[in-house]
């Protein structure tokens, strides 16, 4: 039986994924900003799927996603582009009592349900991302 170890400074990034990895630069920019603040990140497309090298059926993907969330100290939701999986991951993290930082770009709509379970909501641009990440993560 595999033992899960909670890593105090590890975040799960919930974000809409694309088969062509069109938002990989955004994912990498977010993760780099977290890492500069001393936080490890877990990203399904990178860490489970190896940027398309490995595929999962939906049931196994969600099971593995939940397993990874259980090893993290918090969840960061990037909701500029909506996705059903993102909402499922956020709901799971909330049910587990994890803090949730919701990030979205200035033009994006914030779902009221996600706002209701978020520890903090912040709008950002890539230009101001690094300067704000440390303050946002103080809540974790």
Predicted regions and their residues:
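Conserved catalytic or regulatory cores that recognize and/or transform ribose-phosphate-containing ligands
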Residues: 1-140
């Amino acid at each position: 039986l595999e033992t899960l170890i909670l890593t105090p400074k590890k975040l799960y990034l919930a974000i809409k994924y694309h088969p062509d990895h069109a938002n990989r630069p955004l994912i990498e920019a977010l993760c780099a900003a977290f890492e500069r603040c001393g936080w490890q990140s877990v990203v399904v497309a990178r860490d489970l799927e190896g940027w398309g090298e490995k595929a999962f059926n939906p049931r196994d993907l969600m099971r593995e996603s939940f397993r990874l969330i259980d090893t993290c100290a918090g969840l960061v939701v990037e909701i500029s582009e909506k996705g059903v999986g993102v909402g499922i991951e956020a709901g799971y993290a909330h049910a587990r009592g994890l803090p949730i930082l919701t990030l979205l770009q200035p033009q994006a709509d914030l779902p009221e349900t996600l706002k209701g379970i978020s520890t903090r909501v912040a709008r950002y641009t890539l230009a101001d991302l690094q300067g704000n990440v440390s303050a946002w993560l103080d809540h974790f």
